[in-house]
Amino acid sequence: MQVYFIDHDDYDHTRALFSVESGKEYDDNKERAIFYARGVLETVKKLRWCPDVIYCQGWMSAVVPFYIKTAYREEPPFASAKVVSSLYGEMPDATQTERFAECLEFRDATPDAIKQAGVDLTLPDSLGRLAVAFSDGVIEGEAGKQDELLAYAKSLNVPTLAMPADDEKAAAYKAFIDQIAGGEEA
């Protein structure tokens, strides 16, 4: 197994993961998500990997589906890739900043693309909505934590998988992802 690390001195080496000890989130968490999303996608391109399915887990990867379906949609590694996102209870508390919207813009990943998808970046769950709107499938990562986002996915006809029992997770995830990769109805 190959393992690659992407880091940034300002984002990684002098602080905790998402917040200070008191629990206050870092103001640039969403900008960090953009940095890592683009870093990973550029690495996939450079290594000439062509994934069939890209699995995004949690809010930190929420911008990845948006980038794959807009800015990277014509890149050979991503042109036919399917995107599956897992939703968990944690989402950043801070509202989207103007800086976030500016940082998010890249190639065809524009405010117009976000607006056309019906995503409002000022809403508290906007990162989750962004992931859902540009995903080919959505998995409930924590039972009952993102009911509104699952309902949103269903309203967009995005296939969803409710959180399976622990002893059924591996088989359920595999079947769901195989279904998405094969293009079958969920």
Language model: regions and residue ranges:
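Catalytic cores of nucleotide-sugar-dependent glycosyltransferases that transfer UDP/GDP/TDP-activated
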Residues: 1-186
